[in-house]
Amino acid sequence: MRSRRGLLIVLSRPSGVGKGTVRKELFSHEDTRFQYSISVTTRKPREGEVDGVDYFFKEREEFEEMIRNEKLLEWAEFVGNYYGTPIDYVEKTLQEGKDVFLEIEVQGAIQVKKAFPEGVFIFLAPPSLSELKSRIVGRGTETEDVIENRLTVAKEEIEMMDAYDYVVENDQVELACDRIKAIVVGEHCRRERVAKYYKEMTEGL
């Protein structure tokens, strides 16, 4: 039983919680039917990241032109870099009845919720703040100042989890993926998402 319009599934987390890791594992599952909406960013690619797969990497001037032309569903500036979601792909895919999966920063998720309150908003939480710091430091790509800034922002973002519908603890990647899939199955069965279609069906009897 599925509603005709696709679900917008929004996943975000504090820096260092492993959002990209969870997304990659989730999309490696054969039963995953989400359409991944790739974000646009002005930050430099990290080792192993591929343009057009992990992000669309843009120059700052290009991104600002997209803002002016209203080509972004949401955008935010985080640690000196822009991040945003192209709007055309999202709306087209939802209209086709396909689920769209976004992984975006907390600021961006709050913008999206204003435009798509019917979306499913999932906050990926760390097991603890000490574990969060270990993950950020373990990257080996950040200066001490950047690490401290990320931790400060992460604490602020955790305090904003009330804006989300669900909280999934990322203690183990596989378990986090199972929880996310279970949430989506349940959301597709919510009465308010499917009732009108069944009412239309019974009108013809």
Swiss-Prot record:
Molecular-function GO term, any one: guanylate kinase activity
Entry superkingdom: Bacteria
Localization of this protein: Cytoplasm
Broad class of where this protein is predominantly found: cytoplasm
Catalytic activity: GMP + ATP = GDP + ADP
Keywords in alphabetical order: ATP-binding, Cytoplasm, Kinase, Nucleotide-binding, Transferase
Enzyme class: transferase
One CC-aspect GO term: cytosol
Ranges where the Guanylate kinase-like domain occurs: 6-185
InterPro entries, alphabetized: GK/Ca_channel_bsu, Guanylate_kin-like_dom, Guanylate_kinase, Guanylate_kinase_CS, P-loop_NTPase
A Pfam cross-reference name: Guanylate_kin
Binding locations of ATP: 13-20
Coiled coil residues, start to end: none
Entry's EC annotation: 2.7.4.8
Its job: Essential for recycling GMP and indirectly, cGMP.
Family in the record: Belongs to the guanylate kinase family.
UniProt-recorded name of the protein: Guanylate kinase
Organism: Bacillus cereus (strain ATCC 14579 / DSM 31 / CCUG 7414 / JCM 2152 / NBRC 15305 / NCIMB 9373 / NCTC 2599 / NRRL B-3711)
